[in-house]
Amino acid sequence: MKEQIAGFEVEHVHGPEEIPYKRDELVVLCLVRDGEPWVRSFIEHYFSLGAKHIVFLDNDSTDGIVSTASEYDNVTVLRSKLAFGAGVEGIVGERLMRRYLIERFGSNRWSLCVDIDELFDYPYSDVIGLDSLLRYLDSKSYTAVTAQMLDMFPEKLSVNSRQEPIKGLRDEYRFYDLSRIDRSRMRKDKDASRNNIIESDEVAVRVRGGIRDNVFGFKPLLTKYPLLFSDGTLEHISVHAVRNARVADLTCVLFHYKFYAFALEDYWYRAIEHKRGRGPFMNRRYEQYVEVLEKNTELQLKLESSREIASVNDLLENGFLVASEGYIGWVDAEEEKNIWQADPQSKPYELAAAFLESRRLARAKTLTVGRLERQLLEHRRQEQIKDQRINKLKEQRDSQGQKIQELKEQWLDRDQKIQRLQRKQQRLRKRNDRLKKQRANVAASRTWRLVEGLHRIKAKALDVRKR
């Protein structure tokens, strides 16, 4: 079956072209170019998570990702040469290809659209399966789930140091840092214009920053909507935006292994070159990557504020992820059901009940601690904003004081000039008075009268001659 995206042919390379699956089963969708270093970790993670099928849409790769992905069952590989940054009727090629995947494989069912360097996980995935998560979302009629990207990194990273893909990616890249994370409330008018329903204020938050702010000096937007139920009204605008969505009351995580690319020999440079042409904003960002990576052969990433990931649930307790009481109640009920189904003759009953109760209390505590952590961070953020405003007012006050001092000095200088002019004017008046007196004295003298008489005689003589 041949299909097209904006006039570009979609070639089928491997795996089934049609994928039947139930409402509580998940297909993973991935638009990828040159993703061979990640592909095995990617496939193994999502199958271990419980995904039914994985679909790759390869965008003209030059490495071996297509052949590597084609080694696996329950994997479909497609290929298109539509340019990543090409504009087609005002929509870039990247978005067109993602929409194609969602509309073709996710119609009236759940799909997870992620990048090759993103590994999705959700709160209490150690307790409930992926099918249970999807049933919970269906029970609430949700059509979109928010996920926050979390950059993972090793203690140290040597730029351009690796030629072969790493085997234990998650083991080596096990650190994260929340010290430069910024959270901001979503604008209600913007959500209204997109016709999204977000019932939870804790979910209606955009997250930016993180370790890339430390290293490269910019705050990337970390909030995405990867898990979608395409019901015919929901619209995928971009990885960071949806329209006509009913957004779930919990957030999930995308463990992000972008820093791994920087360790691969020349890989990061090729990837950046491929993504140029996406507009001046993105070009400036990629220039920042290049500038830092060309100057530093080694990046010291692990700081005092860095933490080692043990479980996705850690991110609930430290406030990075959120979940509602309704979701926690679902997890509690699923755990209880699973225990009794696994061993219906469990004895003594009191021990099992006590175990379940302790687990419930622990999850309730985690939820409370997470909320307190977010409140503390918000309080600190407000204090920082307050301090910034105070400092700005002080600067304005100092600036105004300096201007007042400058005006005083100008006024004083003007007064001094006026006084000098007044003194000069007084001197001129005195000199003028002296000259007047001198002239009067001269006019009154005998010599002056004699001179005037001679002038009169001379004038008469001239007059006689003329006659």
Go through each PLM region and give its residues.
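Catalytic-site signature of metal-activated, phosphate-bearing donor transferases
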Residues: 2, 90, 124-352
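Ser/Thr-glycine-rich phosphate-binding loops at phosphate-binding pockets of nucleotides
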Residues: 30, 57-67
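N-proximal low-complexity "stem/linker" segments adjacent to membrane-targeting elements
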Residues: 1-44
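Boundary detector for helix-to-coil junctions that initiate low-complexity/charged tails
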Residues: 339-467
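Short beta-strand/loop segment that forms part of the nucleotide-sugar
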Residues: 52-60, 80-81
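Short, acidic, metal-binding catalytic loop of nucleotide-sugar glycosyltransferases
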Residues: 44-52
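Active-site-proximal specificity loops/subdomain of glycosyltransferases
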Residues: 66-113, 121-126
